[in-house]
Amino acid sequence: MAREPQRIRRRERKNITAGVAHVNASFNNTMITITDAQGNAIAWSSAGMMGFKGSRKSTPYAAQVAAEDAGKKAAEHGVRTLEVEVKGPGSGRESALRALQAVGFHITSIRDVTPIPHNGVRPSKRRRV
């Protein structure tokens, strides 16, 4: 039985000039997703996708590399201006933002959308190292 040759799907070039960069900086990783105004993903990247493993994923440099990668992918689709939404307490927040500026995007606004509980669930026990 001969296998049929698989069709390679080429990524369609969307022509979007303005987008929203969602930077999710947790203690363990940094994820960057660039979407259009409606929230449809255009490009994404994370520190883990860039080859960083373990505790190196949470470094500012890993966030910078991931943001540059997501920015280059989004620039191929014609994105020039970005609104940035930053979420989470991680160390890659500012470095991801600077990397997006360095790629050449015009950043119109920066919003912190970190969810803050109004005394929600009980936190986990303290770490003893």
Swiss-Prot record:
One Gene Ontology MF term: rRNA binding
Alphabetical list of Pfam families matching this protein: Ribosomal_S11
Record key words, sorted: Ribonucleoprotein, Ribosomal protein, RNA-binding, rRNA-binding
UniProt GO cellular component terms: ribonucleoprotein complex; ribosome
Record carries keyword Electron transport: no
Keyword Ribonucleoprotein tagged: yes
Example of a GO biological process term: translation
Cited InterPro entries: Ribosomal_uS11, Ribosomal_uS11_bac-type, Ribosomal_uS11_CS, Ribosomal_uS11_sf
Known partners and oligomeric status: Part of the 30S ribosomal subunit. Interacts with proteins S7 and S18. Binds to IF-3.
Family according to the record: Belongs to the universal ribosomal protein uS11 family.
Role this protein plays: Located on the platform of the 30S subunit, it bridges several disparate RNA helices of the 16S rRNA. Forms part of the Shine-Dalgarno cleft in the 70S ribosome.
Protein name: Small ribosomal subunit protein uS11
Organism for this UniProt entry: Rhizorhabdus wittichii (strain DSM 6014 / CCUG 31198 / JCM 15750 / NBRC 105917 / EY 4224 / RW1)
